[in-house]
Each structure stands twice: as C-alpha cells, then as structure tokens.
A protein has these predicted regions:
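Conserved, mostly hydrophobic/aromatic
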Residues: 39, 62, 93, 153, ...
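C-terminal accessory subdomain/extension
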Residues: 291-384
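Active-site loop ensemble at the mouth of alpha/beta enzyme cores that anchors a bound cofactor
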Residues: 206-207, 239-318
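Flexible, glycine/charged-enriched surface loops at secondary-structure junctions
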Residues: 56, 222-231, 342, 357-360
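Active-site loop/helix belt of alpha/beta enzymes
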Residues: 150, 156-270
Length: 384
C-alpha cells in the first residue's frame, strides 16, 4: 500500500499536514481528516449489504481518488474492484495495486483510448460506450495493443447525460461490440446520478423505479438476442437499497458512503427521517485564525479548502456556532455567544465530499485523538 505508516522525511506544515502519532490538535490546518472508526464501520456496512443481497460492489474511486482506500474497500468491504471517471484516474489507482477497474465514462480521444488499451495490459479494464464510431476506435486500439477491452453499453436512465436510450439502441450497440475484434460485451451501465441527492424519498424512489424498469426490459431484449450481461451496473449512496433489491442490478457503484457529506444529511428515508446508516467520516480540520469581533470568528478553511457547490459546510457536533460565509482563504463563523478563541479547532462536514477530496494531497487518519495513518490522494487533479 501507499500509506505512510511511520514518520518519514516529509516536513509537517510544508508538504504533509501531520506525522504518525501526532496529536490531532497539532495537525496543520486546513487538513482533510478521516475518522477511522466511522470510515471502517461504513465500509463494513456496505460490504454486509452486498453480501446479504448476493450481488457485487464496484466501489467508486471518484469519491476518494486514493489507491489505499480502494484497496481497503476491496480487502475489508468485499468490493470486486473500482470505478474511475477518467483514464488518468484509473491509471493512478491501478498503479497503486488495484487490478479490476471500470472507467464509468466515455473515452473518445484517440490518445486516451491508446492509454486505456495500455491499462488493459496491467488490469481488467472495462469502459462505457454509447457510440458506434467509438466502438471502432476502441477495437482498433485493443487489436494494436494485443489486449481485450470490456465494454458496457451506457443507458441514459434519467440523468440526462451520457448514454443511449433503453431498448433497441442498446441491443444494436451491444451487437456491434460483440462482433468487434479486441472487445467484449460485458453488460450495461445504468446509473441514475440525478436521483442520488433527491431529498424526498418517494420522488427518489420513483426515479429509480423508472430506471429499474428500463434496465429490466433492456436486459430481457439483450437475452433474446443471446447477449448476456455479466455486469448490470449502477446505483449510488442515495439509492443503492432500491437497485440492490431490484433483482436485475448485480453490481453497485457507491462512492460517498465511506465519507458522507452535508448534502447527504438532507436525504430522507421512507419515514421522513434523515438517512443515518452511514456516519460522517470525512472532515475539514480547521483553526480559528482571527477573533476581532465578539459575534464572529474567522477560520482558515475557505473556498480553496472545499467545494461548496452543494452548500456551505456544517460544523460537526456543534449547534452554538455556524459556518456562514467563505472567501478564498477564509471561513466566517457565526459565534453569537463569543465562545471561540484563537487556534480553536473545528470539524467541518463538507457540502460535497468528492470535489473536496480533489483539493488535498493527503488524508489524515485519526483514531482516539491521534494520527494513525497518512494516505496520499493518489489521483488528485488527474482529470484527463
């Protein structure tokens, strides 16, 4: 593994935020910290669900972009492999030791296709397709490299992004793949990404039910043409319990469940309660850097320390103070009772975990108030 498990020549506060054994209060801020107990519980919980349903979990590495975390999910959570969104991300994760990867996206640039074929020499490599000409390019690259690339036909099952319409367009593309040298038709990709953060349970369920019906009908049409789906993939943290019980999806692609974020705390279950089976495990560790006003404090985690596309962060475990505004390098904390002091530490739950992880080089694993491990964000910034 790539984790730093003992002190090294890295310089705390310059190129790494902490060292093994350090007290959490001494970690350089802002830092991305993981509550290891909560993280491990989340991984086990998803692993238990998958095992109970008799299906597979291909954990989505776009959340964490870390080879160490991917390997942990495989070893301790029963994941069969990982998803990545870009070729470069997949290359970094495979270089870190993962041997089964799905690029759950379209790869159409010829140079990137060439790299994808190179990846297939080192790991099981699967890619999504939604275009006949793209199949030709993938086939040519696979033949040239002497490899086999597995392909999933992507269905647009409601997200309005990539993918063909369900039914006959899927069958036509699957036939094209199956007859192309260097390629294998391995199934379908049907991820309803737009439903994951729909807060209302019945609305979310309705969107996934519609996707499940499209997938069920399409799988039947493929089977009628002797085209078997080894993978029927999709599902995310906000919907996995629907697809997992559908009887047609056999490979979940959840990512955020390991960390959770502030927006997922707004997603409701059937009873109208906030979904709480997974715990918050990811936090931005920040320090109060200025306290010149009685009713406000300024912390060192601003826009450059997080993504706020899904809203501002929530201060974990506190109701007396609130994160209310941010600029590039500063966060404004409402402190009506004048409680905070210089250098006080706060744990922020990011509004959106995935893009927040992409602005850090390191995860700092914390247990019992001490730094237990340092994991590099292996594929940080690899968006090609």
């Amino acid at each position: 593994m790539n984790a730093i498990t003992k002190n090294s020549d890295l310089v705390v506060g310059y190129n790494v935020p902490a060292e093994i054994g350090m007290d959490a209060n001494d970690v350089a801020t802002p830092a991305l910290i993981i509550d290891l107990d909560a993280f491990e519980k989340n991984v086990k919980l998803m692993g238990d669900f998958i095992k109970q349903k008799g299906i597979r979990h291909r954990a989505h590495a776009k959340t964490h972009k870390s080879a160490d975390i991917a390997l942990y999910q495989i070893e301790h959570g029963g994941a069969c492999g990982v998803c990545c969104q870009k070729v470069s991300e997949a290359e970094a994760i495979v270089a870190g030791g993962v041997k089964d990867v799905l690029v759950s996206n379209q790869v159409v640039d010829l140079k990137k296709i060439e790299r994808l074929a190179g990846l297939a020499k080192r790991a099981r490599t699967i890619v999504c397709v939604d275009d006949m000409d793209n199949v030709n390019d993938l086939s040519a690259a696979a033949v040239k490299a002497g490899v086999t690339i597995e392909c999933l036909v992507e269905i647009d099952c409601g997200a309005g992004r990539c993918g063909v319409q369900w039914g006959q367009p899927v069958v036509d593309l699957a036939k094209k793949i199956a007859s192309s040298d260097g390629l294998t038709f391995s199934g379908i990709q049907a991820y309803q990404g737009a439903a994951q953060h729909v807060h209302d349970f019945e609305v979310r369920k309705g969107q996934i039910d519609a996707a499940v019906q499209q997938v069920t009908d399409t799988v039947a049409m493929l089977k009628a043409e002797s085209l078997e789906c080894d993978i029927v993939g999709g599902a995310g943290t906000g919907s996995y319990y629907f697809e997992g019980a559908s009887g047609v999806y056999n490979e979940m692609q959840c990512g955020s469940y390991i960390f959770m974020d502030a927006d997922y705390q707004r997603v409701l279950d059937k009873s109208g309660n906030f979904i709480s089976e997974f715990e918050n495990a990811l936090f931005i560790w920040t320090s109060v850097m200025s306290k010149t006003k009685k009713d406000k404090a300024i912390c060192d985690a601003g826009l450059k320390a997080q993504s706020v596309d899904s809203g501002l962060p929530v201060i974990f475990g506190r109701t007396d103070v609130e994160y209310i505004k941010c600029s590039d390098e500063h966060g404004v904390i409402s402190d009506p009772d004048n409680i905070l002091k210089l250098n006080d530490k706060l744990k922020l739950i990011p509004g959106h975990c995935d893009p927040t992880c992409n602005v850090y080089d390191w995860y700092v694993g914390i247990r019992n108030g001490k730094v237990e491990c340092l994991w590099p964000v292996t594929a940080r910034g690899l968006a090609f």
